[in-house]
């Protein structure tokens, strides 16, 4: 990015001249977007062309932009070419959206580089689970939590108006507005699906959308206290930035699908966290402080973004009595009594203390619902066979089931109670056995006897695997293994084989959502 800054001179140029618009006509911009070394690959396939980047298509697009030829006029008189028009329009959409996203990210990067001369790397903060140790240290003494689901992004033209505050390039903004009207619909921008064709462009609009909200939040927070924020840096959802400073923590994950934002106030009684379209504001204030924050936030969405804020998307409750749902965990503050025996001289006595502990639980009902949706069990949790995988080899089937089981255990290792995880393991193990028995037209009992303990070995976690190798005769009773909570700091990306379990009623629609799972093999 420093090379871009040298080639494009100063970042202030974007506010004085047409900075981005001329770059849209340069072929090397689209080559950089497609470069696997600079960014993750962007697929321009599945529309009848070769599955690779082609400069001929880019040249045709740039030629049309130079000549100002409207492609709808070209195909209007040819009914037999309407299908071709749809394919070419889809391809041009992918090219332009990638180019727009890449170029409009440059002002974000310049601001980041100007504010942070050196990016401090913290490997622990790369994990998407690093938010929970923060909660354990800071949330146990707090009283109230404001649980907020960020509303769906507004109309794209409203977002373009917000982008003008940090990109004063009239030509590129007009072209962006035309691009939204011609190629995109509001539904396609705010709805994410399995297709990733608009993912990067969606992140561009989503960043501007969330930054406006959090800037407003910071302004209100500074106005509410005599002491202003000690440190605040605006970072964005990109896969190359992750850092940590004294009072502000950011996490950026691979695939640009999630942002973990922790803001620690100078006032230790207030903490703010955001993850995947969900914000949590916890405070130790009185009964009047948190309702005021709730009122300010709701009015901001309605007056500034012209959005009707649903009251079900914001919830104010006490942490001790109402658990909150975050990152596929059910979290709450529990009071645990503890007895301490003290002895003074010859007299001994017991002291009873109540300690607050941050508990995290596995949402077993949504996970079973997701397993039922993926045809591993029914809605009651009874395992069934998966005939779709019957064509694979036996080792491949066992490996698939075992990988999903290990990933679930790996991700939910921080749970306070792991009994429900063994229920999930039972469902997957028996579903695997029934799938193999159906493939070989045998019974489950006979097939398990033929495989022996090697079948169970594939479903063991790393801790259980050590015990299995050390004490093979005692490997079937492993319920006491890993009773304590363990937060793994290697969960940083998506594993496509095990991301089905978050497709539950808690899924946030309309956001670039990271579907968490373990990357551990």
Curated annotation (Swiss-Prot):
State the InterPro entries in the record. Answer: Domain_X, Maturase_MatK, Maturase_MatK_N
Record's subcellular location: Plastid
Chief location: plastid
- One GO-annotated biological process of the protein: tRNA processing
Keywords carried by this UniProt record: mRNA processing, Plastid, RNA-binding, tRNA processing
Q: Which GO terms describe its cellular component?
A: chloroplast
What's one GO MF term for it?
RNA binding
Q: Which domain of life is it from?
A: Eukaryota
The record, for Pfam families, names: Intron_maturas2 (PF01348), MatK_N (PF01824)
Function (record text): Usually encoded in the trnK tRNA gene intron. Probably assists in splicing its own and other chloroplast group II introns.
Q: What family is it from? A: Belongs to the intron maturase 2 family. MatK subfamily.
Q: Can you say what this protein is called?
A: Maturase K
Q: Specify the species.
A: Cuscuta exaltata (Tall dodder)
- Native organism taxonomy: Eukaryota, Viridiplantae, Streptophyta, Embryophyta, Tracheophyta
Instruction: Give the gene symbol.
Output: matK
């Amino acid at each position: 990015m420093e090379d871009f800054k040298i080639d494009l001179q100063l970042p202030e140029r974007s506010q004085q001249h047409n900075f981005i618009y001329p770059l849209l006509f340069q072929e090397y911009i689209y080559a950089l977007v497609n470069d696997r070394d600079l960014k993750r690959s962007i697929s321009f396939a599945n529309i009848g062309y070769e599955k690779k980047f082609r400069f001929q298509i880019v040249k045709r697009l740039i030629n049309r932009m130079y000549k100002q030829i409207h492609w709808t006029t070209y195909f209007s008189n040819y009914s037999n070419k309407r299908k071709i028009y749809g394919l070419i329009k889809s391809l041009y959409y992918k090219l332009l959206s990638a180019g727009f996203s890449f170029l409009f990210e440059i002002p974000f990067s310049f601001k980041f580089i100007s504010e942070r001369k050196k990016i401090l790397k913290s490997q622990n903060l790369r994990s998407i689970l690093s938010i929970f140790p923060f909660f354990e240290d800071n949330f146990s003494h707090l009283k109230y939590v404001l649980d907020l689901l960020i509303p769906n992004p507004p109309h794209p033209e409203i977002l373009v108006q917000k982008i003008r505050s940090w990109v004063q390039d009239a030509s590129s903004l007009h072209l962006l507005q035309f691009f939204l009207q011609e190629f995109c619909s509001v539904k396609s921008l705010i709805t994410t699906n399995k297709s990733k064709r608009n993912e990067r462009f969606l992140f561009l609009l989503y960043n501007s959308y969330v930054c406006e909200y959090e800037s407003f939040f910071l302004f209100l927070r500074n106005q509410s206290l005599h002491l202003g924020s000690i440190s605040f840096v605006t970072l964005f959802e990109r896969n190359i930035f992750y850092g940590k400073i004294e009072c502000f923590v950011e996490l950026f994950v691979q695939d640009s699908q999630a942002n973990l934002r922790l803001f620690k106030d100078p006032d230790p009684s207030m903490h703010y966290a955001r993850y995947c379209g969900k914000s949590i504001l916890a405070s130790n204030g009185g009964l009047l402080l948190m309702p005021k924050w709730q009122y300010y936030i709701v009015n901001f969405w309605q007056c500034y973004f012209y959005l009707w804020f649903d009251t079900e998307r914001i919830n104010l409750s006490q942490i001790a009595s109402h658990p909150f749902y975050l990152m596929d965990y059910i979290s709450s503050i529990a009071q645990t009594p503890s007895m301490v025996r003290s002895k003074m001289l010859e007299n001994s006595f017991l002291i009873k203390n109540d300690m607050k502990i941050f508990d995290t639980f596995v949402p077993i009902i949504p996970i079973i619902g997701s397993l039922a949706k993926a045809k591993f069990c029914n809605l009651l949790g009874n395992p069934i066979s998966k005939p779709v995988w019957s064509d694979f080899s036996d080792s491949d089937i066992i490996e698939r089931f075992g990988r999903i089981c290990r990933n679930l255990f790996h991700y939910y290792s921080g749970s306070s109670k792991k009994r429900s995880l063994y229920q999930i393991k039972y469902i997957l193990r028996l579903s695997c056995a029934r799938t193999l028995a159906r493939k070989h037209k045998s019974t489950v009992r006979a097939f398990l006897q033929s495989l022996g303990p090697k079948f169970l070995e594939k479903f063991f976690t790393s801790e259980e695997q050590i015990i299995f190798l050390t004490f093979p005769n005692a490997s079937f009773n492993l319920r006491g293994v890993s009773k304590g909570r363990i937060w793994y700091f290697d969960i940083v990306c998506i594993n496509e084989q095990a991301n089905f379990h978050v497709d539950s009623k808690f899924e946030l629609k309309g956001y670039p959502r990271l579907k968490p799972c373990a990357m551990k093999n």
